[in-house]
């Protein structure tokens, strides 16, 4: 659970990035970017991403990930927790920015 930015939902493969070595070969269009923080060097991956999950960050301050997500109209979840420790790499996840949730797999519709 975190602060959602936007109202969209996206499902894709979690690409957990802790170091950018070799990322350009493994990050694909529609993947979900999972990392501790972003900056302008992440833009090639953010442009391909279906969504962004980032943390731990202060939820009261607009982060680079939030601004980039709003500009590109992709869902973003900002968490207090270190998301790279909780979201398994290469797992199928769904990001629901309206609710501020990240789900394992595809959630059943309510």
Where do the PLM segments sit?
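C-terminal amphipathic alpha-helical interaction region
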Residues: 1-2, 74
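Acidic, glycine-rich flexible loop/linker segments
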Residues: 8-31, 36-110
